[in-house]
Swiss-Prot record:
Residues annotated as domain HTH merR-type: 5-75
UniProt keyword terms in alphabetical order: Activator, DNA-binding, Transcription, Transcription regulation
Subunit structure: Binds DNA as a homodimer.
SUPFAM superfamilies recorded: Probable bacterial effector-binding domain, Putative DNA-binding domain
One Pfam family here: MerR_1
Biological processes per GO annotation: regulation of DNA-templated transcription
Gene: bmrR
Top-level taxon of origin: Bacteria
Protein name as catalogued: Multidrug-efflux transporter 1 regulator
InterPro entries: DNA-bd_dom_put_sf, GyrI-like, MerR-type_HTH_dom, MerR_fam, Reg_factor_effector_dom_sf
Organism for this UniProt entry: Bacillus subtilis (strain 168)
Length: 278
């Protein structure tokens, strides 16, 4: 049977593969023309070659790397079956990853929405909170006046490796006391929220996975400024004292960037909350 020859443009139309892709496949020895005119360098393909593009297109569609495509071209049916089984496993692994990532983004949005729906800033309110998973470490002499972004670097690095998603908030805990000055305050722990429910086993001895418990909290949120920090804490303390509420936890302080623009002055939202008996 006489073979029909097609130019690269004709193969592009017949197989629905771009000319650019066909040239690249030739370059990497994935799909080479049957004949190249030595005078014009035009590529020509035989009719029987077109079937090989079916496998290449199918493997490209499922995201198979080019080097793996080359290997697949040499496989017999039983071997190709095993190859597809492995591709299926890899796809399921990717789907599991994407599903977990979707849940993480959903949780981030849920927390952001809650923060955007707070009552008026600078006013104490009571809120029923869900449990929040955190990773924390002892503060070791850190307090409101000397805490730095760098103080959280170790926690953030661990969260990035465990969650794969950089957290946009961090916090601290301190005991509930009738403070009269910010100089009296020292943090017990610094922490950052954990965004996934994955089992985390490789923490260092100075770190601890724990939770901010589910329950009812007296809260105050405000845009940070040095002069407003202690005034807002005093509002929270006074609110609890005036209503004779029973405190059952430390104060949780959460700091959230309002924006990330390098062209603007840094701005932060501070949330202070303490669990109260229901």
């Amino acid at each position: 049977m006489k073979e029909s020859y097609y130019s690269i443009g004709e193969v592009s139309k017949l197989a629905n593969v771009s000319i650019k892709a066909l040239r690249y496949y030739d370059k990497i020895d994935l799909f080479k023309p049957a004949y190249v005119d030595p005078d014009t360098s035009y590529r020509y393909y035989t009719d029987s070659q077109l079937i090989h593009l079916d496998l290449i297109k199918s493997l490209k569609y499922i995201g198979t790397p080019l080097e793996e495509m080359k290997k697949a071209q040499d496989l017999e049916m039983e071997e190709l079956f095993a190859f597809y089984t492995e591709q299926e496993r890899q796809i399921r692994e990717k789907l599991d990853f994407l599903s977990a990532l979707e849940q993480t983004i959903s949780l981030v949005k849920k927390r952001m929405k809650r923060q955007m729906e707070y009552p008026a800033l600078g006013e104490v309110f009571v809120l029923d909170e869900e449990e929040i998973r955190i990773i924390q470490t002892e503060a070791e002499g850190i307090g409101p006046e000397n805490v730095l972004n760098a103080s959280y670097s170790k926690l953030k690095k661990f969260i990035e490796s465990a969650d794969g998603f950089t957290n946009n908030s961090y916090g601290a805990t301190f005991s509930f006391q009738p403070y009269t000055s910010i100089d009296e305050m020292t943090y017990r722990h610094i922490f950052t929220p954990v965004l996934t429910n994955k089992q985390i086993s490789s923490i260092t001895p100075d770190m601890e996975i724990t939770t901010i418990p589910k329950g009812r909290y007296a809260c105050i949120a405000y845009n940070f400024s040095p002069e407003h920090y202690f005034l807002n804490l005093q509002k929270l303390i006074k609110y609890i004292a005036d209503r004779q509420l029973t405190v059952v936890s430390d104060v949780y302080e959460l700091i959230i960037p309002i924006h990330y623009s390098p062209k603007k002055q840094e701005e932060y939202r501070v949330e202070m909350k303490i669990r109260i008996a229901e």
